[in-house]
A protein has these predicted regions:
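Alpha-helix N-cap/loop-to-helix initiation residues
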Residues: 12-13, 77
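Short alpha-helical segments and helix-capping/turn motifs at coil-helix boundaries
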Residues: 21, 55-56, 140-141
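GT-A fold catalytic core of metal-dependent nucleotide-sugar glycosyltransferases
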Residues: 54-98, 104-112
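Short gly/pro-enriched beta-turn/loop segments at secondary-structure junctions
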Residues: 98-101, 148-150
């Protein structure tokens, strides 16, 4: 069983099942997916996304045992998450090869500040405290931002309003400004909701 924790926010709840669907669609092993929101963990809604520090709650939520994957909610999996899990290393917080940690494979024996203290720290402060554990080895194919490339294994829509606009405008919401990455997202939305939005009924 691969444990996957996703930093999320109430504003983006329509995308949670889309990401979850994309993970399960490609996974060759059982997965346990937990969507974390600030209010679920008793934390402040802070930072540009509201969930920046939630990644550092993962070890505590796992009882400081085993390993887990962290993802942001504005992502879409195009490959087997077991491949991503294979980058894990004992005693390491494995992050992207450019040093960013929006995708991470975490040894949960590592102890960031506890939940009750997370609001007292900026994200960069916690990351600095964990620097000795950070291992930047996950290749760029696991974080292709705002575009589509043939070798992409994970798409990252850094403008979260793309997702919100999908439901505000209706599907296909990208019709006035199509890109290949948006078309891929739209296809997964249609698949994950059975071709109907969460508040729509078949005609």
């Amino acid at each position: 069983m691969i444990r996957v924790f996703v930093g999320s926010h109430a504003r983006w709840d329509e995308h949670e099942p889309v990401l979850g669907y994309s993970i399960r669609k490609h996974s060759t092993v059982p997965v346990d997916i937990v969507f974390m929101r600030p209010e679920y963990l008793g934390l402040d809604d802070a930072g540009c996304t509201g969930f920046s520090n939630l990644r550092y709650a993962v070890p505590e939520l796992c009882g400081y045992r085993g390993s887990a994957i962290y993802l942001d909610c504005d992502m879409l999996l195009l490959a087997d998450i077991a491949e991503l899990a294979a980058y894990g290393k004992p005693g390491k917080w494995v992050v992207l090869d450019d040093g960013t940690d929006e995708v991470a494979v975490i040894d949960c024996s590592i102890r960031p500040p506890p939940l009750e203290e997370l609001d007292q720290h900026k994200k960069h402060e916690i990351k600095t405290k964990l620097a000795e554990y950070m291992e930047p080895v996950i290749p760029a194919e696991w974080n292709v931002e705002d575009t589509f490339l043939p070798w992409a294994k994970l798409l990252h829509f850094t403008n979260l309003y793309f997702v919100e606009d999908c439901w505000r405008r209706g599907v296909p919401w990208y019709s006035n400004h199509p890109t290949e990455s948006q078309e891929v997202l739209n296809r997964y939305i249609l698949e994950s909701y059975g071709q109907f939005g969460p508040d729509q009924e078949p005609s």
